[in-house]
Regions:
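Active-site-proximal structural scaffolding
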Residues: 7-8, 27-35, 61, 65, ...
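Beta-sheet entry/capping signal
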Residues: 3, 10-12, 118-120, 144, ...
């Protein structure tokens, strides 16, 4: 993200990452906070399902829902006493968070059921050197989800990046260095998989944005 900011506006990059200017913190739960908590809940529940050796698409709805509620309660308690419980609006946001996380994990299971990919890691943090000679840069980030599909000789890697807002991949922006996030994630993920699966060919399969939403279909009485 910081590299994309530099490509768009070097001054903005300097003010944000050089001078470390930040907006004044307010006692409120922002959309950014909402996305951070939602990501954390999805990661925690998916990790628990994997740790228990359960299937993402065979787990019962009741058990999945209970795991989501427990995770949301634990994570939102971090917001001291709690900013999320000081109004009816924020209480509604907690309920919405539960619904979105539950639907996302359910949808993930349905998608996995239709293919051969399986989740490899969630929320993978990485540090990676890029460049050559004296022109090297350290790139760091967090990949929401890495899936793999493997046989005796090859491992295919797929990147899933969760977004709470609308985000489309644009190859032109990637060319100009404005939208490189998924490409960097793939490079980092392939290095991770190569280390964990020595002796196998590691191949890129695809990079995808996953829009976290609870869509409502509009319809007239006639339709």
């Amino acid at each position: 993200t910081s590299f994309e900011n530099f490509a768009e506006c070097p001054l903005r990059y300097y003010l944000r990452y050089g001078v470390d200017l930040k907006e004044r913190e307010e006692f409120t739960f922002s959309p950014v906070n909402f996305g951070v908590v939602l990501h954390a809940v999805i990661r925690e529940v998916c990790d628990e399902i994997k740790k228990n050796g359960e299937s993402y698409y065979l787990i019962s709805e009741e058990k999945r829902r209970e795991m989501v509620k427990r995770s949301v309660a634990a994570i939102t308690d971090i917001y001291q006493n709690s900013i999320l419980k000081d109004s009816s609006r924020n209480s509604f946001m907690i309920k919405r968070m539960e619904d979105l996380a539950d639907r996302t994990i359910w949808a993930m299971g349905e998608q996995l059921k239709c293919g051969d990919f399986v989740p490899f890691v969630f929320e993978h943090k990485f540090n990676m050197e890029v460049g050559d000679g004296d022109r090297k840069q350290l790139m760091s980030g967090t990949i929401d989800r890495v899936d793999i599909c493997e046989n005796d000789t090859d491992v295919y890697v797929r990147i899933i990046d969760y977004k709470t807002g609308k985000k489309d991949f644009n190859i032109v922006k990637t060319y100009y260095g404005i939208d490189i996030q998924l490409m960097v994630y793939m490079e980092a993920a392939m290095k991770l998989v190569a280390k964990m699966r020595p002796g196998k060919n590691v191949l890129p399969a695809g990079v995808f944005y996953y829009n976290i939403s609870d869509p409502i279909v509009s319809a007239t009485n006639e339709s």
